[in-house]
């Protein structure tokens, strides 16, 4: 019997939420700290499945660290260079793309025999473009099951040099190459083929590499230049920003139902592109206020929009369920093909579940159109082992209709106590 959670209609949502640390920033910070010279103290680290997979892998690779009892402060003793794997290793990375992709690249600096594997869904998430790029730099990589997908066997060999990579599927491939390149024997020049998706996630990578002592030059995000034979240096203390994607559910809830919700841990100068989600809510009609360390949102009459969402693919999912509350017709979210290669095929899943609550949905190859019904229907929402599906569809309870979320614990990937926090800020009808 699958676990489920029924959310009863919410009359009002109000209060302040201190955001858990960003998944994207947490796993990048752990890897950079592990490769650095010196000791790094990471604060506001996210405690979630993806981060635990990264920590487990680092332990297997000989990295020493100390984690606080609440798992949000981590002191890491850096290796001062690439990992050394003296004996064959197999690392199980669950469904953590933010661990699989960067480690696949970083471990190609090390001669050895390392297998990277994960859950069945991980074996359906493409990694061929990254493997092709690493091979151009001299890496020796074998596919153990299906061509272009994990599991992978790595034998080192990455030297750098001239590399081209397809940017149209996932920005994590470029992130993985960028973070590895400074430790390569040669300088690396990376040319991007196709349109680079999720560009703001590359900005996170560049910003964090700089914090750890490495500068990267680029020409308008089309060519990147990284000097080889460098060393990452610990910044000493590094604060992990709150997760801007996690903020999206609470900001949207305020926009739909009000009161006023303030999320802290991100603000106007955040390194994460997903803070731009608040601009989309504002465009729909919500009232948004920005501080250095917070974003605040309150209800406005929401209107349908038609927008390119390539810059905020994760947070854009929240707009798909917010669209159920928009006046004036059909909301169209465009340029979101990369939803299809995430934790599940999010475009297909979103279309199926939106129809269950009564919406009219057109699902295109890289877009979705959503026309809300006059009244939402009560439904059981499948979550596809995808944390964002569970959190997005919790917003249905902001109507006068209850909603049942199947497998609510799947939020553990990024936000283990999401439903407790939602309940804390909610006043039931």
Swiss-Prot record:
It is found in: Cytoplasm. Pathway: Metabolic intermediate biosynthesis; chorismate biosynthesis; chorismate from D-erythrose 4-phosphate and phosphoenolpyruvate: step 6/7. Phosphoenolpyruvate binds at residues 23, 97, 125, 172, 346, 388, 413. It is an enzyme of class 2 (transferase). GO terms for biological process: amino acid biosynthetic process; aromatic amino acid family biosynthetic process; chorismate biosynthetic process. GO terms for cellular component: cytoplasm. Belongs to the EPSP synthase family. Catalyzes the transfer of the enolpyruvyl moiety of phosphoenolpyruvate (PEP) to the 5-hydroxyl of shikimate-3-phosphate (S3P) to produce enolpyruvyl shikimate-3-phosphate and inorganic phosphate. This is 3-phosphoshikimate 1-carboxyvinyltransferase. It comes from Pectobacterium atrosepticum (strain SCRI 1043 / ATCC BAA-672).
């Amino acid at each position: 019997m699958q676990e489920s959670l029924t959310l009863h209609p919410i009359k009002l949502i109000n209060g302040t939420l201190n955001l858990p640390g960003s998944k994207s920033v947490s796993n990048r910070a752990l890897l950079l700290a592990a490769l650095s010279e010196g000791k790094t103290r990471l604060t506001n680290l996210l405690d979630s499945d993806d981060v635990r997979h990264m920590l487990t892998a680092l332990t297997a690779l000989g990295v020493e660290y100390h984690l606080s009892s609440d798992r949000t402060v981590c002191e890491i003793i850096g290796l001062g260079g690439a990992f050394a794997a003296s004996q064959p290793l197999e690392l199980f990375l669950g469904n953590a793309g933010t661990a699989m992709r960067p480690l696949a690249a970083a471990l190609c600096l090390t001669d050895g025999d390392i297998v990277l594997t994960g859950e069945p869904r991980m074996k359906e998430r493409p990694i061929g473009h990254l493997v092709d790029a690493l091979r151009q730099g001299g890496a020796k990589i074998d596919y153990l099951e299906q061509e272009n997908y994990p599991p992978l066997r790595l034998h080192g060999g990455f030297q750098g040099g001239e590399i081209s990579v397809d940017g149209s599927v996932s920005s994590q491939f470029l992130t993985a190459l960028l973070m590895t390149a400074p430790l390569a024997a040669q300088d690396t020049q990376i040319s991007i083929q196709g349109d680079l998706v999720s560009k703001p996630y590359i900005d996170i990578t560049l910003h964090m590499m700089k914090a750890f002592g490495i500068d990267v030059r680029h020409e308008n995000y089309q060519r990147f230049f990284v000097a080889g034979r460098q060393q990452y240096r610990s910044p000493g203390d590094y604060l992990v920003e709150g997760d801007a994607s996690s903020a999206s559910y609470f900001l949207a809830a305020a926009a739909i139902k009000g009161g006023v919700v303030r999320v802290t841990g991100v603000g106007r100068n955040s390194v994460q592109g997903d803070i731009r989600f608040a601009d989309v809510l504002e465009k729909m009609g919500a009232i948004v206020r920005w501080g250095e360390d917070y974003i605040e949102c309150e209800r406005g009459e929401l209107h349908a929009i038609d927008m390119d969402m390539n810059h905020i693919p994760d947070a854009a999912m929240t707009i798909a369920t917010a669209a159920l509350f928009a006046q004036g017709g059909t909301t169209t979210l465009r340029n979101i093909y990369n939803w299809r290669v995430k934790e599940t095929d999010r475009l297909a899943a979103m279309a199926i579940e939106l129809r269950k609550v009564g919406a009219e949905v057109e699902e295109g190859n890289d877009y979705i159109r959503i026309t809300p019904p006059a009244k939402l229907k009560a439904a059981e929402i499948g979550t596809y082992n995808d944390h964002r599906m569970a959190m997005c569809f919790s917003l249905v309870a902001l109507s006068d209709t209850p909603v049942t979320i199947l497998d609510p614990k799947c939020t553990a990937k990024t936000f283990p106590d999401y439903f407790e926090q939602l309940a804390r800020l909610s006043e039931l009808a």
